[in-house]
Structure formats: structure tokens, C-alpha cells
UniProtKB/Swiss-Prot annotation:
Quaternary structure and interacting proteins, as annotated: Part of the 50S ribosomal subunit. Forms a bridge to the 30S subunit in the 70S ribosome.
Protein's gene: rplB
Example of a GO cellular component annotation carried by this entry: large ribosomal subunit
Family indicated by similarity: Belongs to the universal ribosomal protein uL2 family.
GO molecular function: rRNA binding; structural constituent of ribosome; transferase activity
Protein name per its UniProtKB record: Large ribosomal subunit protein uL2
GO BP terms: cytoplasmic translation
Taxon lineage: Bacteria, Pseudomonadati, Pseudomonadota, Alphaproteobacteria, Hyphomicrobiales
Region (Disordered): 222-278
Pfam families membership: Ribosomal_L2, Ribosomal_L2_C
Presence of keyword Cell membrane: no
The entry's keywords: Ribonucleoprotein, Ribosomal protein, RNA-binding, rRNA-binding
Length: 278
């Protein structure tokens, strides 16, 4: 879908660049595939802020997306493409041959009326899902499972994808958008194609208020806070912090590695940080 600009009648309109969503369905989502969604304003179960700078925003309804694609060998027709406020990608309402309705992530080049199917051996075309061990090397995939039967976890944002670049016994080797290469079991499911709405990266929010509609509040720097609020806070007049940059909890920021070693490290063949060192 194309990008949309506006007449510069105000500064917010001048800078605004949106994705043209005129081809999407304009009605409400299917009610039986939705759930209520309670906004917590960045607070945890004790009522304390656990994620800073969140709160407000437009009320949203959660769409139940099928990330597992376990209904095998039953063809489904794409009924409509929809906007989903809970994610950057678009979603597709599909109707199976037995009448069941479901939402899936819409891949690029999927259109209303197309047929998709999940199974062990299916055609390599956008929207079809099968175990990655049965796909040819070089296939572009999204909604990739990391554990067998858990449902897709990787490559779900707008425009993202992973590419199968090799095989190693029961595993396939994936190259992710970040540059990381990792092994995933060949029986893990993935959907063929790249995720829709690839122009999302080229949008411009245009004004602060539009960010507030998304539920994001202003992000304050530590040096403008009081000493009680941040290690960089305090000082008479403007100061530069006076110490190496740290988080509000005193941990070094600006690139210090904080990830602990995990048992899954052995599946990462090339780290996503490698290309930053070149």
C-alpha cells in the first residue's frame, strides 16, 4: 500500500505521512474473534509503574489471531483484510471450507479471494503454512515458531521476514532481519511470505498528540530530573550528569551487554551484534 501525505494546513499535517489504508475493510472486527482489552497505564499488579511513559491512548479491542495454524489440509478463502490497532501489520479474516472463521497475519501480496492452506506439504505461496523442514532453502517466511506447537513468535511486525539459508540435520538455519542467524527445529511451523504493511517504516507521526493517541507519554531525560528520580538528576543550573550514562536504576547504558547466558545460546550461529562491529 502507498503512503499518504496531506496539505500543510497545520504543522502537524505538514509533517504527517501515513499508510493509505483505503483498501482495507472499513467495518468493525468479527465480534466472536475479539476480546476486551484493559489498559493498565504501565502499572503492574501492585499499582506501581513497571513501564515508564505509558498511559492514556485510544481504547482498543484485541483481535484473536491464529499464530499456530494447526487446522491442516483445510483450504481457506480470504474474506477481507483489516486494520489491527494492536500491531503494525494488517490482518486477514479467512473462512475455512467447513465454515470456520479465523484471523491470521496478512502477508504481502495476499488479496481478497485468495486461498490459503496449512499442512505438511503445501504450495510455496504467500499465506500458506507448513513445517520449515519441508520448505526449500531460500524461502522467505514469517510468523516463525521457536518451539514446536507454541505458535509463531518471530517475524510478526510489519514488513519483517526471515529467510531459510540452510539445513543442519533436524534443524533449519534462519537469517533474521537483524542479521542474526539461528537454528530452529525443522518441525516448527512458519508462514510463507513477508508480513504486510512494509511501508510502516516510512511513516511520520507528525505531532506529539498522535503519539499520545497511541498510549505513549512524554519521555523525560534523567538530567532534567531531581536526584530522587534519577542518578543523573540534580545540580544547580544545567548539568551534563557528571557520570557515565546509566539507567534510572544505576546500570550502565549506551551499549553495555546485560543479557545473561542462556541454554538457547547454542542455537545462535551469528549474533545480530556482529555486523555492528564491522
Amino acid at each position: 500500500m502507498a503512503l499518504k501525505t496531506f496539505n500543510p494546513t497545520t504543522p502537524g499535517q505538514r509533517q504527517l505521512v501515513m499508510v493509505d489504508r483505503s483498501a482495507l475493510y472499513k467495518g468493525k472486527p468479527l465480534k466472536k474473534l475479539t476480546e476486551g482489552k484493559h489498559s493498565n497505564g504501565g502499572r503492574g499488579n501492585t499499582g506501581r509503574i513497571t513501564v515508564r511513559f505509558r498511559g492514556g491512548g485510544h481504547k482498543q479491542t484485541y483481535r484473536l489471531i491464529d499464530f499456530k495454524r494447526t487446522k491442516v489440509d483445510v483450504p481457506a478463502t480470504v474474506e477481507r483484510l483489516e486494520y489491527d490497532p494492536n500491531r503494525t501489520a494488517f490482518i486477514a479474516l479467512i473462512k475455512y471450507a467447513d465454515g470456520e472463521l479465523s484471523y491470521i497475519l496478512a502477508p504481502q501480496r495476499l488479496a481478497v479471494g485468495d486461498t490459503v492452506v496449512a499442512g505438511s506439504y503445501v504450495d510455496v505461496k504467500p499465506g500458506n503454512a507448513m513445517p520449515m523442514g519441508n520448505m526449500p532453502v531460500g524461502t522467505i517466511v514469517h510468523n516463525v515458531e521457536m518451539k514446536i506447537g507454541k505458535g509463531g513468535q518471530m517475524a510478526r511486525s510489519a514488513g519483517t521476514y526471515a529467510q531459510i539459508v540452510g539445513r543442519d540435520h533436524d534443524y533449519v538455519i534462519l537469517r533474521l532481519n537483524s542479521g542474526e542467524q539461528r537454528m530452529v527445529h525443522g518441525r516448527c511451523m512458519a508462514t510463507i511470505g513477508a508480513v504486510s504493511n512494509h511501508d510502516h517504516m516510512n511513516t511520520s507521526i507528525g505531532k506529539a498528540g498522535r503519539t499520545r493517541w497511541l498510549g505513549r507519554r512524554p519521555h523525560n531525560r534523567g538530567v532534567v530530573m531531581n536526584p530522587i528520580d534519577h542518578p543523573h538528576g540534580g545540580g544547580e543550573g544545567r548539568t551534563s550528569g557528571g557520570r557515565h550514562p546509566v539507567t534510572p536504576w544505576g546500570k550502565p547504558t549506551k551499549g553495555k551487554k546485560t543479557r545473561s547466558n542462556k541454554s538457547t545460546n547454542k542455537f545462535i550461529l551469528i549474533s545480530r551484534h556482529k555486523r555492528k562491529k564491522k
